[in-house]
Amino acid sequence: MYYLTIDQGQLLTGIIAEHGMSGMWFIWASWIGTFVIPLVFAPLWRKMDFMTDNQFLLFRYPGKSGWFLYQFRAIYVGGFVVTLALCFHLIGFARIAAFYFDISQENALLLTGGILCLFALKNVFDLKLKMDVLHAILFFVSLAVIVFSLWNLEGSKEAFFTFFKAHPEKKSLFPTNENTWFSLLVFIGIQWWSCNLFDGSGPEMTRFTAVKDTKGAILTGLVPIVVSFLVSFIMIGHILLILGLKNNQINPEFHYVESVFQVVPEVMKPIILLGFFGMFITTAEPLMKWGASLFTIDVVKGNFHPTLSEKQEKKISFGTMIFLSLLAVIFAFYIGNLQSLIKLIFSISAGVAPVYILRWIWFRINAWSQLSAMLSSAVFTLLYPSFHTYLLFSNYPMQESRVVVVTLLTSCVWVIVTLLTPNQSTEVRLNMLPIVESRMIFIRRFTIAILLGIVFLGIVALSWHLLLNN
């Protein structure tokens, strides 16, 4: 879980305010699998040359079933999944815009959606060079101003522990009751594999295919992890300072936004806004491009118009990005907080992730396996709240219980479907072995990556234990 996104400050503030430091295992659990992509999958993606990650499906799954999955995933991921991810970032910046311009949350959502549409135009027609580096610099400057302003407030050093003095039970890194222990076990035992993008497929796949060698692919995956590790301490540290300040906001996620603009000097507020805006665009643009490429290249060009010109591709991509932006705005009107949204996404992902990982070495898995996992995981996730009170897990938190039940049910569904559908493993093995080399090499690298992730998880937890108790 990387910390350079517009919504992270709000999300983490909400988690710590509601659950205390033990709630951070929801985020920290991602360290277990964070090295899997750069050490295991990035070198594999570098060996292949695909315009979209969806094209891997035609390579991995032969026959009509592979083609059907290829089409379905382009629409499902390009429409539904990308919209949810866009919605997450859109809500984060809309809250900032609402407070800065003193407008309603509804108007801020419409304003932010309009901005996304404008940047979709810039994306497609290449009006100027990508500004990711400038956006990152602006964000770091903004973060530095926020931290400096908080640290120079009167009594700020004491404010670091003010929140824990008022809520001593929230200082502990470990759960204090049965329900929170259950949540911790779910985070570490199941949810960790849904915190990242499974096997590196998605918008980041193109970063791995663009490098020249395996070393470059690994470094491309490792650099964001190192940056994330360092920034995480700054993020949580300044959030603890913010939680120590008095605030009238009922929603702790809004507490972060209001406090930031209260503590920084008036002259610096436009810089803060620009920093948040730059990071919002940097994270939203790749998602829009990913969704548009899936629809334009895999659906339209792959089915209806193989000879699509570059100009026509741009028009369709632009239209798709506009549609995704507007759809994200509509979704955002019905979402109350970022925690509920990300837990919904993690629940859907937890049921699907095993297929994405195992498909590289278990050649019996076919297109129907992945299709059934995607459908059942989404359906079970959406239906679960209606049945929670009738199940054995009814005494435990609903969202964590949902992850367990959805993962178990989805796994049963796709394994049964795998065994009942045609075995194409002979043909698949011929395609995959030159890429994977051998199952033993894959398993060895995967094991090393997991062990390294567990070590980093221990370092993070131990570091915060020492910081909070010394």
Predicted regions and their residues:
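Membrane-embedded helix-loop-helix hairpins and adjacent transmembrane boundary segments
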Residues: 1-470
